[in-house]
Amino acid sequence: ALFSELKRDLDVLPIYEVLVQHYPKKQYWTQLSGLYGQKDRPMDQMGALEAAYDDGLLNKQREFTALSQLLFMFENPRKAANVLQDGFNKKVIKEEEKTLKALAQYWHASKELSKAKPYYKKAAKISKEGELYIFLGQVHFGLDEFSDAREAIKLGLKKGKLKDEAGAHMLLGQILFENQEWDSAIVSFRKCIDVAEKQYSVKKKKQKDKDKQKD
């Protein structure tokens, strides 16, 4: 209790920095990581969590996800993927949309397309939006799996709520072209143009409405 009161009045960061050197317990590493975070020192925040992970001390989902997010932020997607994958393997991390999506994206960013594929597939099935099927289609396309890529993109378009519907039609056209489905490819490219024109018209109208409100 006394130490808790002192923590409110003192900068305890140096104390924890000494503690982890002599008594490298999980609670000291995680608290040190949190203190670095409060002081806007994300690299040190990551380093403290990484040290705890390397010593096998992390055992909660939020700890694995926090470390993987920091690693990804500092452009180390492969280690981010390995950390999160380890959490899945140890049954520490639940298979839910956000965790499956994160692992898929980390493997994707690491150019490990075959490893990203099953996690995009699981996440896409759970998601209420079609975006993850588009990512799955990109992965299949990158692996020259044109038929699977085509089906994934179609599922994404069907599910809808896409950030870039025109881009999805463009990608589908490319896949169909590579699969020598010429007529279908042309239809997709035309659909891409139609959707892009509609999106531009909507955007232009919104801008006009904003300008009118300013006047």
Predicted feature locations:
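Alpha-solenoid helical repeat scaffolds
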Residues: A1-D215
